Amino acid sequence: MRTPAIVLALAPAAAFGQAALWGQCGGQGWTGAKTCVSGAVCQAQNEWYSQCVPGSGGGNPPTPQPTQPSNPPPSTGSGLNAKFKNKGKLYFGTSMDHYDLNKAQLTNIVKAQFGQITNENSMKWDAIEPSRNSFSWTNADAVVNFATANGKLMRGHTLLWHSQLPAWVSNINDRNTLTQVIQNHVTAMVTRYRGKILQWDVVNEIFAEDGSLRSSVFSRVLGEDFVGIAFRAARAADPNAKLYINDYNLDIANYAKVTRGMVEKVNKWVSQGIPIDGIGSQAHLAQPGGWNPASGVPAALRALAAANVKEIAITELDIAGASANDYVTVVNACLQISKCVGITVWGVSDAISWRPNDNPLLYDRNYQPKAAYTAIMNAL
């Protein structure tokens, strides 16, 4: 698989003379090489980023194919995904990662039951670009290749997040440097998987609980501007992927993180031309009586769907105790909202859940379906 040469994007022209295939060759503030190696032509992606793409004499790069038709055909299978798609949705998916690929019980369930995969960790910044301009694709590639081989859609998770962030990024305090680093990282990732990712979580967990921006290197150095920088870079790299803003605690309709945070800010950013296609609600839910039980999800999803975005999705669903009624409540909430295109549960089995004491998933520690699984199947 091709490794983009964007790793050279910040190298001075004097050192390299010409930019390599897929390397940066222009844009506002660019001082590096502005001509491309033989067999490539410099093409402007936007005002701040030009890239060496295959061709000669000014030809365009190959047009990426749409990742998913807007109206998927009915599925003829019998698992969760098939039944959910037959209700008009795009997918019922799960998270997994490269370290799960040798677990036969898990992969067999994924193949039979789920239609979409999210990398749990291997697409996060510390895994992909642990040091500046040094990219490590092996683990992320393994999951994408598994998904492609088995006909599964992919959600890319995540391009910008304050956590699992290398120190070399966290320590940046210069606006221009951080802008270039974001553009380079986002472009490298989205370009590599262009045409293979249905939805990208472009920015993840950027809001504090009061709806303000979370304090992070991105907000401290760039203010709100990092959102537009990241989304525009992602759109330029893959015009067909759906671009999401993703967060947790979006499960109560009148909570500030939903109202003053997600809905208000997204509407403002979309009005400014920032290409935000969707809102992802993680939905790490509590048991009844807890802070954010499943009973709040229907109204919360309606509040999110009222934002000026094309679609919404439940992106990391797990529910403490895995009550059958709670899972059916969430599934029905998505079914009743046309903008809700899919549900992803955050893991296959309680044996590998990040909430091991809550037993929050659809399969138990022995990879056997629980009552919640049966209830969803019956509801569909």
Curated annotation (Swiss-Prot):
Keyword Signal found: yes
EC numbers for this chain: 3.2.1.8
Coiled-coil residue windows: none
Residues annotated as domain GH10: 74-379
GO CC annotation, single: extracellular region
Keyword Phosphoprotein: no
GO BP annotation list: xylan catabolic process
Domain CBM1 as annotated: residue spans: 22-53
SMART domains: fCBD (SM00236), Glyco_10 (SM00633)
Disulphide connectivity of cysteines: 334-340
Signals that turn on the gene: Highly expressed both in culture with rice cell walls (RCWs) as a carbon source and in infected rice leaves.
Active site, renumbered: 205, 316
Record's subcellular location: Secreted
Pro residues: compositionally biased ranges: 61-75
Keywords: Carbohydrate metabolism, Disulfide bond, Glycosidase, Hydrolase, Polysaccharide degradation, Secreted, Signal, Xylan degradation
Main location: secreted
SUPFAM superfamilies noted in UniProt: (Trans)glycosidases, Cellulose-binding domain
Reactions catalysed, as given in the entry: Endohydrolysis of (1->4)-beta-D-xylosidic linkages in xylans
Pathway assignment: Glycan degradation; xylan degradation
Segments for region (Disordered): 53-80
Superkingdom classification of source: Eukaryota
Leader peptide range in chain numbering: 1-21
Function: Endo-1,4-beta-xylanase involved in the hydrolysis of xylan, a major structural heterogeneous polysaccharide found in plant biomass representing the second most abundant polysaccharide in the biosphere, after cellulose.
Family under the similarity heading: Belongs to the glycosyl hydrolase 10 (cellulase F) family.
Official protein name in the record: Endo-1,4-beta-xylanase 6
Taxonomy of the source species: Eukaryota, Fungi, Dikarya, Ascomycota, Pezizomycotina
Gene assigned in the entry: XYL6
